[in-house]
């Protein structure tokens, strides 16, 4: 039905400015950000998945949004930008993380990436702290640089503890509350009054279902074939159509995007190595 699909479609459209913002923040170029957004817009997988009334689109939307906030935090520095300003990006990231896991559990897996980015950022602040102590031990340091190094040495322990405590609230407590609130329609169901024990039962059922799933389907393919789209998913084939007419829905990416993109990722890995 139209009502089931229109909201997911709108979220799919909203992903385009998110992609632009992500690419712009990474590349610092409007040209490359526009190209990334165009390639995303013409991808068949994105087009289909946002129009078939599944919940994946909502999870991916919030994952993209939380990654944008974490990327902004990655590019900030609480020594220079101030602790409160960095908290804005971190807080927004944590709330979006809650929305992501409330939409689908894939938000949990994306949260692992957030953790890596966050602790890497803290490690960079720690390295700056050590370097500042070394600079202060040297002689002949410029007064302005000496003041900033002193600021780093004095604030690192306090800022780090405050940041970690802030993250406990915004990445553990608040997401848990958001996740629980997403079950309000379930708990308030008029036909049968459900309890928190029932909510926990749903969690164990979902985990057991996915961890023990052995069922197959004709269009399944192993994960290592996905980047090459060797066997796309065939969702729908029309029936009872006029002679000479056919209708089908298949989910697969744009080969011009996926194949060249996959090769580009491999090339980037070699360049980093």
How would you label these PLM feature ranges?
Residues 36-41, 48, 68, 97, ...:
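Short helix- or helix-capping micro-motifs
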Residues 12-15, 40, 55-67, 108:
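Hydrophobic core segments of transmembrane alpha-helices in multi-pass, intramembrane catalytic enzymes
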Residues 128, 156-159, 166, 175-229:
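Aromatic-rich transmembrane-lumenal/periplasmic boundary elements in polytopic membrane proteins
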Residues 6-27, 65-69, 267-272:
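Transmembrane-helix motifs of polytopic, lipid-linked glycan transferases
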Residues 239-273:
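Hydrophobic, aromatic-rich transmembrane alpha-helices
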Residues 88, 131-135, 147-173:
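Membrane-interfacial entry segments at the cytosolic side of transmembrane helices
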Residues 4, 8, 45-58, 106:
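Short acidic/glycine- and proline-prone juxtamembrane loop motifs at membrane-interface regions
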